[in-house]
Regions:
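Catalytic core of membrane glycerolipid acyltransferases/transacylases, capturing the structured
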Residues: 10, 17-18, 30-89, 97
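Non-catalytic C-terminal accessory region of glycerolipid acyltransferases
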Residues: 3-4, 93-204
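Short gly/ser/thr-rich secondary-structure transition/capping motifs
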Residues: 17-25, 89, 146-149
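A short beta-turn/loop motif at secondary-structure boundaries
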Residues: 28-31, 157-158
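Generic structural signal for residues in well-ordered beta-strands
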Residues: 22-24, 82, 140, 165
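A short N-terminal beta-strand-loop micro-motif at the entrance of redox/enzyme domains
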Residues: 23-24, 29, 168-171
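N-terminal membrane-anchoring alpha-helices
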Residues: 1-23
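A residue-level signal for beta-strand positions that form part of recognition/binding surfaces
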Residues: 21, 35, 162-164
Length: 204
């Protein structure tokens, strides 16, 4: 790990455990080397660091371009493997950025829903992740996060609440899984990934 990434990793882990009683299960399913997609449900700004501390090695993320316009914040997040995406241009920009990262052998975090949930429930999948899988055929690790909505909901305040991250078994795809290079085919694959995430249960 790069020094700043290692520092943020350690700090995030400490805060997650002390403030949010963070727990993780299924970490043996994580692909720690080579290109892979970490696909998770999205409820909160806490989700990226929670996924980050669940994995042993560095991950790469996409972040809104506007965040990089703030000099200090932009400098910080770029040093912890965040890349800017212009959301005003739609999913295409994000898809291209992620494909480039995967082709370089990096492991990236993707939220199939595309944005944070307003009520904590899993939303409808967008076709972007399906397109990325079709173009790269990299393995996908489904991850479900529990409790981050209660800890920091969209538009709400941050507060202590237990969070749990559960990692499912990797999914692998071949060309035959795709009916064609079209939006409908990509959407079906995206829905398969999101269904795998939704099927993950929190251990009692």
């Amino acid at each position: 790990m790069k020094p700043l990434y290692r520092f943020c990793y350690a700090l995030s882990g400490f805060l997650a455990k002390t403030v949010f009683s963070y727990r993780a299960f299924g970490q043996e399913n994580i692909i720690e080397e080579g290109p892979a997609i970490m696909a998770a449900n999205h409820q909160s700004y806490l989700d990226p660091p929670l996924i980050g501390i669940t994995c042993r090695n560095e991950l790469y993320y996409l972040a809104r371009k506007t965040l990089f316009e703030k000099k200090l914040l932009g400098s910080l997040i770029s040093r912890v493997n965040a890349f800017p995406v212009d959301l005003s241009r739609g999913d295409v920009t994000a898809v291209r950025a992620i494909i480039n990262l995967l082709k370089k052998g990096h492991r990236t975090v993707i939220f199939p829903e595309g944005t944070r949930s307003l009520d904590g429930k899993i939303q409808r999948a967008r076709p972007g992740i399906g397109m990325i899988i079709a173009k790269t055929l990299v393995p996908v690790v489904p991850i479900r996060i529990f409790g981050s909505f209660e800890a920091w909901p969209k538009g709400g305040k941050i507060r202590p609440h237990p969070v749990t991250v559960v990692v499912g078994k990797p999914m692998r795809f071949v060309k035959e899984d795709f009916g064609g290079n079209n939006r409908e085919s990509y959407q079906k694959i995206s829905e398969r990934v999101l269904a795998a995430i939704a099927a993950i249960r929190r251990p009692d």
